[in-house]
Amino acid sequence: MKVFNVIKKIMLWVCFLGVVISLPGCMVFEDKVLISLGEYKNSEFYTQGEFQDYTDYAKYYYDYVDFTENEYFNKIKESDLTQINEHLDDFESWIETYRGTDPSREIVVNYDFDRTIIDCEDYIYIDSEKYATTLDDGMTISGFTKYNIYFYDTQTQILYYFHNNI
């Protein structure tokens, strides 16, 4: 009987620890960059992927956003366009990969971003991580580990959000 009680206590502790360890994964994600823009009137959100590997595309519609005190966004400069296009090239390559395996996926069907709307009146915030790996033959391969791109188009007052974590 004592052995049973000891095993019971151990199992309860294991269950308790399992719950405590898993709680952070259940917490609601708070997007401070999105919150910094104030309340949006409508949104569209499309995703593809699983627990760790996923791609998101979203549009947030605003009536007005004041960027004067915003700690995240900067007005786009001509010199930013290379970095923006590099990220969008990567993002769109994932959209094409998904299109090749299943063209009916919601992110494929609803991806409608048009780069021609990008100009120096718009605002951008990019948070990204790169990787570089040198192969045995000395060749280096590099790319993005993950990124969040927030692009605000001032003409339409739409925030476009691009996320990739693959």
Placement of each model-derived feature along the sequence:
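N-terminal export/targeting and maturation segments
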Residues: 20-93
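Sec-dependent bacterial lipoprotein signal peptides
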Residues: 1-24
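Intrinsic disorder/low-complexity detector
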Residues: 7, 55-58, 65-68, 124, ...
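Extended hydrophobic/Leu-rich segments
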Residues: 4-7, 12, 67, 72-76, ...
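Extracytoplasmic electrostatic interaction patches
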Residues: 91-166
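Residue-level detector of functional hotspots within protein domains
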Residues: 12, 43-46, 145
